[in-house]
Amino acid sequence: MRLMARTATNRTATVRRTTKETDITVTLDLDSPVSTPPTTGHGFLDHMLDALARHGRLGLSVRATGDLHIEPHHLIEDVGITLGQALNQALGGRRGIERYGSAFVPMDETLAHVVLDLSGRAHLAFEPERLDVWGDAGGMTHYHLREFLRGFCNHAGVTLHVRLLAGREAHHVIEAMVKAFARALRDAVRVTSEELASTKGLL
């Protein structure tokens, strides 16, 4: 069951997604940076969602439960799906948005690069899956992040390229990629005109 709402005047949305594995509610406000600390039951995922909100300057609330006693994959992927649905709702017709965003983020020995397009077309190119990244961060791996971003892209209609230019330690790799994603998204959702950024007349 999914419950969705979008206000008529503000770029906000609330989405609830319930399955046999997870129950997730995401509230997203693209124009207010006031956020609520995330509560997913997974400490490192909460940390990354907080980084996403802060570096993306997003109003974000995520409340989630899931079958963490099995493995965090379902919860992490489903939070990405629900966040993507919320972004799609909040953007509405996407008129006036900058559309494109990119960011480099260093974290000690790590350097991440993210480029995205709010095109309405879903695609994820995730380069780090071909690299040797060491270990995990609080039970979260870069493969979990890939599934989070894949779910997000598929349900938000976003083309996303993620590159790891340097780094191997999982905590730094994941955090740098999330922060680069947040900063690229921050630029792409900005309203910079009254026109649609497409020669087709549709995003």
From Swiss-Prot:
Keyword Cytoplasm assigned to the entry: answer is yes
**Membrane-spanning segments:** none
Q: Where in the cell is it found?
A: Cytoplasm
Catalysed reaction(s) here are: D-erythro-1-(imidazol-4-yl)glycerol 3-phosphate = 3-(imidazol-4-yl)-2-oxopropyl phosphate + H2O
Care to name a GO molecular-function term for this sequence? imidazoleglycerol-phosphate dehydratase activity
Keywords, sorted A to Z: Amino-acid biosynthesis, Cytoplasm, Histidine biosynthesis, Lyase
One GO cellular component term of this record is:
cytoplasm
Per the record, the domain of life is Bacteria
Q: Does the keyword Glycoprotein apply?
A: no
- EC numbers on record: 4.2.1.19
- Kindly report the protein's main subcellular placement as a broad class: cytoplasm
Q: Which GO terms describe its biological process?
A: L-histidine biosynthetic process
Pathway per its UniProt entry is: Amino-acid biosynthesis; L-histidine biosynthesis; L-histidine from 5-phospho-alpha-D-ribose 1-diphosphate: step 6/9
Question: NCBIfam families from the xrefs?
Answer: PRK00951.2-1, PRK00951.2-4
Q: Which family does the record claim for this protein?
A: Belongs to the imidazoleglycerol-phosphate dehydratase family.
According to UniProt, the name of this protein is: Imidazoleglycerol-phosphate dehydratase
Which taxonomic lineage does the organism of this UniProt entry have? Bacteria, Thermotogati, Deinococcota, Deinococci, Deinococcales
